[in-house]
Every structure is written in structure tokens, then in C-alpha cells.
Amino acid sequence: MATDGASCEPDFSRAPEDAAGATAEAAKKEFDVDTLSKSELRMLLSVMEGELEARDLVIEALRARRKEVFIQERYGRFNLNDPFLALQRDYEAGAGDKEKKPVCTNPLSILEAVMAHCRKMQERMSTQLAAAESRQKKLEMEKLQLQAVEQEHQKLAARLEEERGKNKHVVLMLVKECKQLSGKVIEEAQKLEEVMVKLEEEKTKTSALEEELSAEKRRSTEMEAQMEKQLSEFDTEREQLRAKLHREEAHTTDLKEEIDKMKKMIEQLKRGNDSKPSLSLPRKTKDRRMVSISVGTEGPVTRSVACQTDLVIESTDHVKKLPLTVPVKPSAGSPLVPANTKGNVCTGAALGRPGIDRQASHGDLIGSSPPTVPPPSANRIEENGPSAGSASSTPPLPNSTAPPTVQTPGIAPQSYSQAPPVHSLHSPCANASLHPGLNPRIQAARFRFQGNANDPDQNGNTTQSPPSRDVSPTSRDNLVAKQLARNTVTQALSRFTSPQAGAPPRPGAAPTGDGGTCPPVGRTSLKTPGVARVDRGNPPPIPPKKPGLSQTPSPPHPQLKVIMDSSRASNAGAKVDNKTMASPPSSLPQGNRVINEENLPKSSSPQLPPKPSIDLTVAPAGCAVSALATSQVGAWPAETPGLNQPACSESSLVIPTTIAFCSSINTVSASSCRTGASDSLLVTASGWSPSLTPLLMSGGPAPLAGRPTLLQQAATQGNVTLLSMLLNEEGLDINYSCEDGHSALYSAAKNGHTDCVRLLLNAGAQVNAADTNGFTPLCAAAAQGHFKCVELLISYDANINHAADEGQTPLYLACKNGNKECIQLLLEAGTDRSVKTRDGWTPVHAAVDTGNVDSLKLLMYHRAPACRNSLHEEESESVVFDLDQGEESPEGTSKPVVPAELINHADREGWTAAHIAASKGFKNCLEILCMHGGLEPERKDKCHRTAHDVATDDCKHLLENLNALKIPLRISVGETEPGSYGSDDFECENTICALNIRKQTSWDDFSKAVSQALTNHFQAISSDGWWSLEDVTLNNTTDSSIGLGTSSVRSIMLGNAPWSAGQSFTQSPWDFMKKNKAERVTVLLSGPQEGCLSSVTYASMIPLQMLQNYLRLVEQYHNVIFHGPEGSLQDYIAHQLALCMKHRQMAAGFTCEIVRAEVDAGFSKEQLIDLFINSACLIPVKQSPVNKKIIIILENLEKSSLSELLGDFLAPLENRSTESPWTFQKGNGTSECYYFHENCFLMGTIAKACLQGSDLLVQQHFRWVQLRWDGEPMQGLLQRFLRRKVVNKFRGQVPSPCDPVCKTVDWALAVWRQLNSCLARLGTPEALLGPKYFLSCPVVPGHAQATVKWMAKLWNAIIAPRVQEAILSRASVKRQPGLGLATAKKHPSQGQQAVVKAALSILLNKAVLHGCPLPRAELDQHAADFRGGSFPLSIVSSYHSYSKKKGESGAWRKVSTSPRKKSGRFSPPSWNKPGLSEEGIRIKAVSQQNCNRNASLSKQKSLENDLSLTLNLDQRLSLGSDDEADLVKELQSMCSSRSESDISKIADSRDDLRRFDGSRNNPAFSTVNPRMPVSPKEVSPLSSHETTECSNSQSKIELGVSRVKSFLPVPRSKVTQCSQNTKRSSSSSNTRQIEINNNTKEDIWNFHQNEQVEKPNQ
């Protein structure tokens, strides 16, 4: 471009050219496009575009001008007003010059053409105008509709505005409330925060206080422990020092007495010319050495029995130096005897002086010493407390027997035949009595030996030295060997006794360690084997100082009573080696006498006194009274129901340093076995020997042995000092139990030693340790009445509800023994009053049995402190039924605490506490029981006796006077109008229960009782099973399933006086009933008169909620029709709803009228019109609506055609306004418009299960209420109605399910359900029955025959005719679905008759007679009363059902009628050969037996006889229609099915019947009759077997009846299934069925059996 631009510029350098030429060139160069610049080109382009646009405008203007000129030139001469000119124009323009013809040649023709053209145009315009007018009309219609819509829209908009305004207001209110509530919430939150802060502060303070308190508790516990330790140390030291002092004193005294005795014995031996007296001294000293035990220095030498026999000799001279008295419970004992340091008191030892009495054998000394009276100093005996004999002439004797008693042969019989080492706690007498023939001087000497040996110390503590010569009882050889060393002494003694034949020890006797009842054999009897029985003589002379002993201070421990008077001398006989010995007990302390029950003499000796004492002989070697001795005590019967075990203190008391022989206790007299002699209730109740209790519980020292035994002894005797010493020892088992299971705690609690119990509990003793019978320490203390021990044990968490082996609790034992304080403590601790013993007794039984009024009051009225501590402040809640609040109530205004179940509890024999009190004449106890509102005085025992029957005269009078008024409570539904409303079977009144009204019953209690009775009754009649009122009370729901409750009550009549719940009169209910002579209480339910439906619900048993729903439908929709099977109470429901509506409208101020019209076949449409007009239901359009309410009921609409009767009224009924009028043509040709107003209600009833045909057109215009037989309310109505009938018959009581009445009612209910199931299965809904016909079922207790007869009448009169008509109607070929039963043939064919008879027979057997509660024999008699039961079902079974495969048409079925090929075994059944048919029947029965089929008909003989009479075999079942064929197949399937008793599984596909051929499991299909209305539920695919298989598990042989042939057909598939697999379950997975009603049970139809087996479907 630069070059271009440059070249465009003129070049002035070429001057030589002339000027003209230059100018021309310059001009050319200017217009050269190529030389133009870009901007110049753009300018040039724009100029050219402007020129083009100007040219276009000029061209357009020229064209327009040309057109105007052309038009003016051509058409300017023409005028539109002249048609000729137009025609001429067209002519000239249309054709060429050649074709142009002159237009005006014929003006007429031209005019005609113009006219024709105008006519055509006019016609076209007229059609267009008509179309425009129609469109205009449509537009106007649409405008009108639009205006109406706009008006509606405006109305809706206005309503919405109003609603929005209201909602806005509500929202504002809610917002305001929310703000207020949020403010309150904030305030509450602030308050809560403040409270939480305070709570935290309080928690902090509380925790600080708790810490301080725990610290204080720890300090106090530590201080107590230190104090206890110091006290125990002080006690130990004191006792040791005291024992040392006693030892020294005793030693000194013994030495003096020994010197005197030695001198006297030497003289006596010299006079007796005895050759062996020299042996006594060495043996004496030797024995002394052997028994010695050091006090404080030596530990207890606890040698076992076997060891001690050999080691005894090693203990040497410690005896003389250190005689030890162990502080046991202070008792009479010998101060001379040294024992082990810690209290190993030699329980069984004859504890003599150190010189003599400590020896194991003193027989030589006794035998040689002359009988002398011991000096007073030698006989210083202190008794531990006042024993019963202390005040008598006979002083209490020491607890240890003198050694001679055991050594001498005479002693052996006393302990047991061979048990010399028995520890006689009344030593002198026992020893003396052993040798009644002895010289009195020798007896006196022996007496002195014994007395000195057992003299107690000043504190009454016996110092006993363990014997050293005793041999282990298990080794008789050792025993005899040891005894041989003592033979000389024994022979010396025996010379002074009457000679007896030598009686060696009994072989086979139990060893010492046994706790058994037989006496130990191998005891260390110091007598020689040849020693004979020693005859007992008079008691020895009493030492002069003995009586004074009773004046010594008694120990602090409580003394237990003794059994016998010591002043009363009596001879007790003890059987020893079958010989009886007498012992004089008068000089013995009763507290120390022990009885051995096992050796009770069978024949008492003539000397036996009524209250003999018994000698407990003591082994001279120190044998303890062991468990062998005590275990003999179990022979006595227990007074108390439990605690039959001897006390622990009777356990074997083994002495550690000696050989312990369990010496048996020998019973001296049979009379000593008398219970009740002991004051210890527990002892006597436990069966202890009364003589044993003083031994173990009296103040005298009990025999002591090993540490555990010592512990039990100390606990038994209450020796706190010894117990504390023992508890401080290490390694001691404080929970040690003897063979009877008695622990130390048990013994202490049983004997009431509270201090010992506290010590043991603090030491950790097991508080709930039980003995062998399950009794705990608390049981023992409660039985004995030791309430302080009970309180202490409870505070240590003893189990207050512990039950012994027989079920006795501490409360029971306390009640049994009348221990009021213990009962109160246990009740306050919260013990259970309802625990029962094994015999069914409760504490109430126990208290009543003893006649203890205080105990019974406590049980009935005392509350646990959890409620209130005071017995009289509390007010118990009122009991449900009849409560007494007695004026005479022993507890003032308080009410019983125990429930009625406990008061009325019966034991094994059926006896209640009232039976016991009445039979024993405890009138006060019976009166207290009668104060309880729940007492049932009519309760019967197992012998059907009431308390009145077994009562004494006084108690009978009391029961008759205190018995409650029994007022029947009845429910009334008001007066029901008789007639055709379906209420004929409804009872006006029903008794629901009897109210017990007592003098103490208040009006509040009465009101609660009535309310509870009503609630229970409503729940009982509406429950699913037979529940009693007691079972129903567990349900706390206020309303029953039918909707009734206490709110349904209108008023209550007390006799003739009105009363309302909660109302009170000045008189009590008792007085009011008596004064007004009210014989019943009637409850009136609210009914239609009050605008309620409660009475209708109760009368008809239709749930209240459903009735209220029906009423709502009528009031809301105005047109309601009730339809269901005949007898479904449609008329009753409609009429009751109408009554309720009428009274509601009248209460609202309207007048109301009910108009009933019964429709029949002749009821015409004109009559209906007159009815509507006359009742003012149809009113003229010109007339304004009336305020009157009209309710029209059209009954039995099934008898007319709904479409014909109501067809014209459908629209006016649906749209009730003048806009939808109904025109009525009058007879004179005029018409008038009517309409239905809003105040008209129309109800109709139809007794038809379903609508058909043209009636279905009516269905959409009405609201329909369908009353199905298999759905509520009809399904449960009959069950509830009959249950209420039974309750009324039993006067309010619900019988048990096994009652015959219940079974009969259940059968009637099952008949109705099974019958409808079968009829539905057959496809005959016309024959379905509602429950109305079954409401009249008679309820006669004990007479089921009446119900069966009623069922026969119902069957013959109603059921069978309906079934017959329905079957014929279905079997007829030309069946019109609209007319139902009316078109059945009047003259049915024989085939149809056969079908009817077969159907009746099958229904009768499967639905009616099946499950009848009558025995088979009676049922066979009544079966003849039923019509149609004798038809031979073999006809049905041998009928061939034709196969029809899936997808085949009916035409194909008719073609393929030839039966399938049979197998070679069976010939095909023939219609024309009766023989073959009967053979088929027989074969069928055999096959059924093979399959374990158990279905049989009632009368086989009659069936067989009638086989040829019913129909000719040539004509049997020659059915001519598909309906008949389908029906027969239905019947066949019903026969073969075992689950048709409740056909809830309805399947139209069925099995082929078995035809005895080889084909197996071959199903046949049948089409559903297209003319029959079948619900989809009734169709299901075919299964290989329809319902169930035949299985062995379901086969039952009928009782007492051989199986008979069954003519019922069986599906072929079942033969195969039964033969191939008989153990399969009755339901198969291949079975596919559609269930109706969701029933999950299939019933097996066993005809004429009393039970009906059911199996659930899988």
C-alpha cells in the first residue's frame, strides 16, 4: 500500500511535459480504483450503496404508479353497483379475443345466472349462520358454567380467608403461649440450677459427714476391739489364777481325805480278809500320775482315742501338783480333778482326788474301803445355780461320776450293757445304785469317793482329771487287757454285791465314735468280763454336808429347769443285757440325769416309777457323753413341727488327754420318755429325751472334751467366760457342727444365751448355718421364744425366710409355739407370711392350731415398718371384693394386711385356717378370721366339708351369725320389645355373681366390689377361653373386648331402691339390705333410650365399637343396608340403631318417627312410593323441608328385586335436594316432582350372603354393612352369647373347661362354624346360617342329651331343608343366579336326589355329629333322630370323577369321558353291578385300614342295609349336568379330606378319588361353575393331595370298638403316601392352598369319636 500510495502522488519532477497533458493524467489517476486508499474505497462503497437504495425507491415508486395507471385505465369505467359491468369485465378479462362473446346478447339469461349464483350464496351463508348460532349458544353455556365456577371459587376463597383468619388467630395465641411457656421454662431452669447448686452443696456436706462418721465408726470399732482383747486377757488371767487357787485348795483337801480314806479302807480290807488289797495303793498312785495335766504350762494333750489308750501311762505326777479346774458353766463338780489347762474338763471321768479319783480305775479302793460317811470338808460341792433339786433333801451332786461306778461290773449295765465308761453326772447315786446289794458301809465309802472326786470348787467349777486307764472302744482286746490288771479290785468289789452270772461285753456293739443308736461295745469298762449284773438296793446314806451345798452362790448364768424332783425317790429300771437294774434317783441331781432312749426297756420292771430319773454313768477313764449317747435321743416324737434333732451340746465330748469313750446313755424307765417334762419347747419338739436337757442345759457342769466340743458346751450352758477364752484361741473352728449339724451358735440361740450369741456372731460365726433338718439358729431361737436372740440374729442379717427341710420358717415356728415377741420382730423385719410347709400349712395355720389369738392378730394386722411402724395407725387399702372394716375389729380401724388367698389357703387335706379353728373350738381365732373380708367360709376340704360342717357348736353359731349376706348381682338390659326384631333369644337379666356383704362392709367397699364384679364379668364373657373370675382379675384393663365397662352402667337398684356408684347412705350396706329386704342388686345398662348402645351390646354380644360405627354410617350416609346370611341379626341391629337415633334426635329437640316395612314377594314399587310419601320422606319440590326426622326400615329386601324396587330412587336418594327431583306420574295423567330431604334415613336388611345379577347395580348407591359368618361381629357373637348363658346358668361362676357343659357349648359352636365351612365349600351360599338359630342352644348342666335333641330339631326343621334347596338349586341345569333357591326343580331327578342325600349325610357326619360330647353308644341312639344320616356314601365314593387337565376346556372334558386304564389287580367299578360296587367298598375299607384311616360312619349296618334301598343301582348318580358333576366332586373331596371340620382352606381343585388302579398321585381338575359367583379366595391350584396325608401318627383305634368299614372315599394319592411313608407328617410342603381367615389349624374328621385331632399347617 505504501507503494500504491506513493505511486498515486503526482511526480512534479517531470517538468518537461506540457501542462495540459499533466492535468489529464492527473485526472485519470484520481479515479483509478486501484490507486485508491482504503478509506477512499470505503467512502466510495458507501456512496454507491446510497445510490442503489435511491434507485430501488425510484423503481418502487414507478411500479406503484404504473399499477395505478393500469387499474385506472382498465377498471375506471366500471362500477360495482352494476352487475352487468362486472360480468362484462370478467368476460373481457377471462377469455381471449377469439373466445369473447357479447355479454349483453341475452340479459335474461344473464339475470338468471346472477340469481342462481345469489341463491347458492344465500344457502351457504344460512348454514354458516346456523353454525355461528350454535357456537354462540355453546359459548353462552360455557360462560354460565364459568360464572358458577367463579362463584364457587369466591365462596371457597371466602372460606379459606375465614379459616386463614382463624388459623392466624390460633397461631398468634400459640405463639403467645409458647412465649409464656418459654419464659416459664427459663424460670424453671433457673430454679432448677439453684436447686442443683444447693443439692451439690448438701451432697458435699453429706459426704463430709459420712467420712467423719465412718472415721468415728472405725475408731470406735478399734477401741471396742482393744477393750475386748483386754477383757479377754483379763478373763483368761483371772480364770488361770482362780484355777490355780482351786487346784491348790483341792489338792490339800484331797490329801487330807485320802489319808482318812486310806485308813478306813485298810481297816475294811483287813476285816474283809481280802488277799489283794495291797494292789490298790500302787494302782491308785499310778493312776494319779497318769491323769495329771499341767494347768498353765502344758498345752492340751489332745490325743485321739486310739493313741490315748497306750500313752496314758506316760503322764505322771502332775496330777497331784497341778489339779486344774476349768471354768465351765459353774456346775457341781469335783474340785480335785486336774484337767487340761484351757478347760479340758474330763467330762466322763470319775474325777476324784489326786490320789484316788484321778485314776482310771478305783474299783480296788472302793471294794476295800469300808462304807463311811465323808466328812463335810470332803463333800464341799457347789452347784451352778439353783437346780430343781437343790432345795430338796437331796443335794445337787457333782457332774462327774466316781471312778468306781464305771469300773464295777454293775456299772456296765447302767451305761449300756457293755458301756461302763458312761459319765454319770449324778455320780454318787449312780455309783451307789449300781450295787444295790452292797454293804451300806461300802456304799458309803464309794459315795465318799465319788463325792470327793467331784467336789466343785468355790465357783462351782469342777476340776476333773482325765482318766488314764481307758482303752479305745474300738479295741476290745486292749479293753480286756487293761481290765485284767484291775480284776483284783473288781473282784473285791463284787464280793459285796449280789453274785451274778458273768456277762461278757456284747459282741458287735458299735464302737465309740459312732453316732448311732446302738451302744458302743469296746468301752474301757473296768469291770471284768465275768462281772454279773449288780442288783440295786437302797440309795446310799447322804453325806451330812451335802444339803448345805445348795446354799452356795449360784452362778450368773441362767439355770434351766430340771426334769424330776430330787426329793422324790424313784427306782428306774435300765435294761442291761436283757436284765433290768434299778437305780435310786432320789439322791441324784435332776439336772444331770440323761436318758438313753434306745435302751428303753420293753417291759418295765415292777419298780418303775412314773417319773424315774436316769443315771448317766461315766467312764472312769473320763469318757465324755458323746454323740453316741446323745444320738439315742431321736426316738421321741416332736411336739413342734420341726427341730427334731438333739442339741449340739449332746455331741461327743472327747477329752484330749484321755481315751474318750462315747458312753451310751441308758434309759432307766419307759416313763422317762414322756415329752413335755422339759420346759424347753424346742427340745421337746425335737424329740430329745427330757432327761438329756438338764444334762446339757442345767447349771451342773456338762461333760466337756475337745475344743469344738468345749465350744458347744460353753455355748449350751451360757458360759461366757469359757466361750470368750475359747474364741480367743487360734485355729478354733467356731462353725464346727456335731453329727446333728448343731453349731455352737445354734446351741446358744436355742438356749437363749444372748451374750454367747453376740460373742459368736462378733467372732464371725455363720448366722445361717443349718443342721441336718435344715433348722438355723434363728429357727431355734424363734421356736424357743428367745426374742432377744431373735432380734440379735436378725440384726446380723439372718435369713428370716429360711425354710427347713419340712418347710418350717422362723415365723412358722414362732407361731406354732405362740411366741408373740418373736412374731412381731420377724414381721417387722419383713418376713414372708405366705411360706408353706411341706404339708401345706402356713403361719396362719400354725397360729390357729395353737389357738393363740395374739399371734393370729399379729399375723393379720401387723405391718412391716416399711409402710408404718405403728400397728394401729395404718389404713390398709380396701380389698377388691368384700371388705370388712369392723366395729369389732380387734385392731381398731385397721384392716387386715394378709390377702384373702393366704386366709383361704388349704393344706394337703383341703383344710383352711377356718376349718382348724372351727374344729378345735377356737372361737376367738375364728372370729378374727371372719373379720377378714376375703374369708370364704364355704370353702370345702377334700371330703367336701365346710368349716361349718366340722365346727363345734359355739363356732357353728359364730359362723352362722358372722356369715356374709349373699346378694346376687344381676345385669339388666331393660325391657326389650317382643316380636320379630331378633331379640326373642335375648335374656333381659343375667346373674353375674353373688356379693358378700358383711356388717363391716362400707359403701366404698361395696361400690368397689360391684365395679370389680362388672369388670370381671365383661372380661370373662368376652375372653377367648373358659377363664375364671380369678384369672380375669389379673387383667387390669378397665374395658372388655366388647367395649363394656363401669361407664356403661346407667343405674343400680338395691332391691327397689335406686343407688349410684359412690353414693353413701347413713346405714351401712348390711343394715340397708336387711331393712329394705333387698334380695338382689340389679345393674341397668345404658340403652337406646339414653342414646347409648351398651345394653344392645350386652344383649346381642356385638362389640360396642362396631355398633357405634354402624350408627355413624347411618347418620353420615343416610342410606345403609345390612346384609348377611339368614339369622345374622340384621333386623335387630337396624331396629336398635333406629331406636338409638330416635332418642338422640328427641333429646336434641326434634320429633322422630320410625317406619318399618316388611318386604315380601308381593311388595310393589307403588307400595314403596306410598310409604315414602305418607311418611313424609318424599316431599314435593315446592314444599319446604320438614324438621321431623324419619327413619325408614325396609326388612327382608332379599324377597324382592332391589333393582326393580329401588332402581328409580337411586339418584334422588343419593342427591337429596330439589335439584335432583323424582317425578311421580299420577293416575290422571298428571305428574308431580318430589325429592328426598336430608332428615330422612333409610335402612334396609337383606338375608343373603352376596348380591347377584342386576342387584349389583344398586350396590354403589348405598352404604353396605356386610355381616359375614366368618368375620366379626358374627364370628365371635355366638361364642360370647353362649358363654354368657353358661355364666348365668352357673349363677356367675365360670365352670372349668373340662366341665361337660363347656364341652357341649363348644360343640354347638363348632357345629355352626363347621356347617358354614362345608356349605361354603360346596358353593351354596344360600344355605349359610347366621348365629341367630343357635342362640337358643339349651344349657342344662349334666344333661348333654338335651342339647343333642335340640340340635336334631334344628337340623330337621331349618338346616336340612335349606341345604336341600341349596343343593337342588345348584344341581339344576338352568339356574338363574338372581332367583336363588326359588328356581330349584320341583321334581328333581334321581341323580339330584342322590346328591342331596349324599350332601346331607356328609354334612351331618362331618359338621354336626363330629365332636359331639356324648359317648358313642348314646350318640348312636340320637343319630337316628337326624334326617338324612342313612345315605350310603359308597355311591359317592364309587362315582367316577372325570379328569380335567389344566387348560382344558369344558367341551374337551365332555368329550374325554372314558375312564383311564385300570391296572390288572382291580376291576373297574361298574354302575350296573351291585356286587362289584360292594366289593369295591370292601376293598376300600381294607385299604383304609392299611392307611390307618380312622373315619367311620355312625351306623354301618343301616348304611349297608339301605344300600339297595336308597336308589336303584342302575340309576345311581346318572348326573346330566356339569353342575352336578362339580357338586359330586365337591362331596368326594369333602369325604376324602380330614380337615373339613373347619374348612377355612377352601380350594376348588380336588384330588381324584381312589379308583383302585395303578395310577398314583394323578390330580384331576374341575372348573368353577362360571354361573356361580365365586370369590377369588375360593380358587387355588391343585395339589397332589388336597389337605393332608394319612399318617400313622394320626391313626387312633377307637376305644373299645373294633374298626368298622368306612364308606368314605379316599384320594388315591393317600394310598401311595401311606404305604410308602407312613411316618411323614400330616402336612406336606407340596400342598399349596390359599387360606381364608388365616386359620392355621386343620381338623381331622374322625366320625363318632369324642376327640378331634388337630395339626397345624406348615
UniProtKB/Swiss-Prot annotation:
Q: Where is the composition biased (Low complexity)?
A: 385-394, 509-520, 1619-1633
Show the ranges annotated as biased composition (Polar residues). Answer: 399-418, 580-590, 1559-1569, 1581-1595
Q: Where is the composition biased (Basic and acidic residues)?
A: 214-235, 1539-1558
Mention any one GO cellular component term assigned to this protein in its UniProt record.
cell cortex
Give the residues annotated as coiled coil: 119-276
The segments labelled Disordered in the record are: 1-24, 203-235, 348-437, 451-475, 495-612, 1448-1478, 1538-1595, 1611-1642
Tell me which InterPro entries the record gives.
Answer: Ankyrin_rpt, Ankyrin_rpt-contain_sf, Cortactin-Actin_Reg, Cortactin-binding_p2_N
- Give start and end residues of every ANK repeat: 706-736, 740-769, 773-802, 806-835, 839-868, 909-939
Q: Where in the cell is it found?
A: Cytoplasm, Cell cortex; Cell projection, Dendritic spine
Where Asymmetric dimethylarginine occurs along the chain?
A: 495
Task: Using the record's annotations, give every residue carrying the modification Phosphoserine.
Answer: 1521
Entries under SUPFAM superfamilies matching the protein: Ankyrin repeat (SSF48403)
Q: What does this protein do?
A: Regulates the dendritic spine distribution of CTTN/cortactin in hippocampal neurons, and thus controls dendritic spinogenesis and dendritic spine maintenance. Associates with the striatin-interacting phosphatase and kinase (STRIPAK) core complex to regulate dendritic spine distribution of the STRIPAK complex in hippocampal neurons.
This protein's name: Cortactin-binding protein 2
Q: Which organism is it from?
A: Neofelis nebulosa
Name of the encoding gene: CTTNBP2
